[in-house]
Amino acid sequence: MHQGLTLSRHTNEYAGTDKLRLAVAAAIDAIAAASIDISELIGRGPLAGITGEAQGSSNADGDVQKDLDVRCDEMILAGLQKIPYAALASEESETLVLGDPGAPISVAFDPLDGSSNIDTNMTVGTIFSIVPNKQGEAPFSAPGNVQLAAGFVVYGPQTSLVLTLGNGVDIFTLDRRDRTYKCIRQQVQIPEHTAEFAINASNHRHWEQPVRDFVEECLAGADGPRSKDFNMRWIGSLVAEAYRILTRGGIFLYPGDSRPGYGDGRLRLLYECHPMAFIIEQAGGGASTGRERVLDLAAKSIHQRAPLIMGSVDKVQRIELLHNDPAAATITAPLFGHRGLFRV
């Protein structure tokens, strides 16, 4: 652990004199600076006029916007206006913010993930993805495997920034005394054998059969096919779920399901699934839709959705197998069925 390593030193050493890397570093530094102000704003809560009440408008994806969503979006946009960019994509904006078409990078971000948790004083965060700009190609039209950097900020008991520059994952925690991010962990690797899974089990009746099969294998415990007792987690905040996986292992599932509008889940590909998949893979994990690698997907629209299953490689591979080979299922009696453990 290198507690003397600050985020700014880390990005400076990464950038050197390379034009593309300098632009990436500038974007990271701008988002980090905005996140410090966002952390202070969230920390003051109602004292700063922060509530979970809806503003009355909706974002491009149809979610009701809260005042804090808009304020965080404005703070990050203000920081990014100071750097060279070709395009910006925000969850809160229906269209792209266009900059210099000759700039080396474009940035996609979710300014405040999990904002519905604000009223309950739970974890929220910021997610971002930085991609190269190729002249002659539409911004953000390439698959996720072209990302140059990705990260997320967790506004929890501590404010921490998780970052990959394509060579592993490092975690920095905000030192509020001098408003700097300092490294607490380098080259994070996801633990392989943690018996935890995270999914919103209330949607069981809407899931595809492979997802049901996987969850039922976990719930069968030590006497079931996985031969161990699993714990279930669900926070409702993607950044919190991802941080737990990085530090403790396990698997997170937000699959598509049969509800209208949920065929591809609820998470957005560009600024949620792509950056999280990049981070998780760089930490030795896997990220899939259940059928294919998330980083192989290219977005056809800036707010396109995709299922996201991420975590320890063995668990991600297991659910991919269940999708691709239904005969691999080892449990036929549904734990949630008429004769199951969750009978009503």
From Swiss-Prot:
Family annotation (PROSITE patterns): FBPASE
Pathway it works in: Carbohydrate biosynthesis; Calvin cycle
Location in or out of the cell: Cytoplasm
Keywords: Calvin cycle, Carbohydrate metabolism, Cytoplasm, Hydrolase, Magnesium, Metal-binding
Positions annotated to bind Mg(2+) 1: 91, 110, 112
Example of a GO cellular component annotation carried by this entry: cytosol
Cofactor binding note: Binds 2 magnesium ions per subunit.
InterPro entries named in the record: FBPase_C_dom (IPR044015), FBPase_class-1 (IPR000146), FBPase_N (IPR033391), FBPtase (IPR028343), Fructose_bisphosphatase_AS (IPR020548)
GO BP terms: fructose 1,6-bisphosphate metabolic process; fructose 6-phosphate metabolic process; fructose metabolic process; gluconeogenesis; reductive pentose-phosphate cycle; sucrose biosynthetic process
Residues annotated as binding Mg(2+) 2: 110, 113, 272
Superkingdom: Bacteria
Name of the protein in question: Fructose-1,6-bisphosphatase class 1
Lineage start: Bacteria, Pseudomonadati, Pseudomonadota, Alphaproteobacteria, Hyphomicrobiales
